[in-house]
């Protein structure tokens, strides 16, 4: 519902296919690939094609409702949708869950470094791969 309200405030349309893709991304609780989304959408939207999914994903990215995990070529729901922000993504190599964390001090330092380097930043996201606490506990059993 928050996504619908946000889109209405911005004057953009959260179409049924966009909403279905958003729900699937959120329901997965893990990074999900576009073709996996297509497989899940097909029973609901038999005419859906890869371009359908990519257009929906592009819209959701533009609206800040999801994030792209570059290293996995996959997508996760944004926990802080509604306003632009930088994120630190902790990605579990075992279960593929992604935790979005605020990291204001890290981002401040990175900002200072890029200014000193006269580097024009287009987007900032840090992806860190490792083992989450749940998987670490399971490994110890």
PLM regions: where:
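Basic amphipathic alpha-helical segments that dock to polyanions
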Residues: 53-63
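Short capping segments at the starts of secondary-structure elements
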Residues: 14, 27-33
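A short acidic, leucine-rich amphipathic alpha-helix
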Residues: 36-42, 53
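Short, Lys/Arg-enriched N-terminal segment that forms or immediately precedes the first helix
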Residues: 1-11
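Non-DNA-binding regulatory cores of transcription-related proteins
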Residues: 62-141
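Pre-recognition alpha-helix immediately N-terminal to the DNA-recognition helix
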Residues: 19-24
């Amino acid at each position: 519902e928050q996504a619908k309200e946000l889109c209405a405030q911005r004057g953009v349309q959260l179409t049924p296919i966009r909403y279905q893709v958003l729900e699937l991304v959120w329901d997965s609780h893990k990074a999900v690939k576009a073709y996996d989304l297509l497989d899940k959408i097909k029973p609901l939207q038999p005419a859906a094609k890869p371009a359908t999914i990519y257009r929906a994903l592009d819209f959701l990215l533009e609206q800040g409702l999801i994030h792209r995990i570059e290293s996995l070529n996959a997508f996760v729901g944004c926990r802080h949708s509604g306003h632009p922000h930088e994120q630190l993504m902790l990605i579990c190599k075992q279960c593929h869950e992604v935790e979005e964390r605020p990291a204001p001090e890290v981002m401040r330092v990175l900002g200072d470094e890029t200014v000193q380097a006269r580097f024009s930043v287009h987007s900032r996201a840090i992806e860190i791969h490792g083992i989450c606490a749940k998987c670490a506990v399971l490994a110890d059993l």
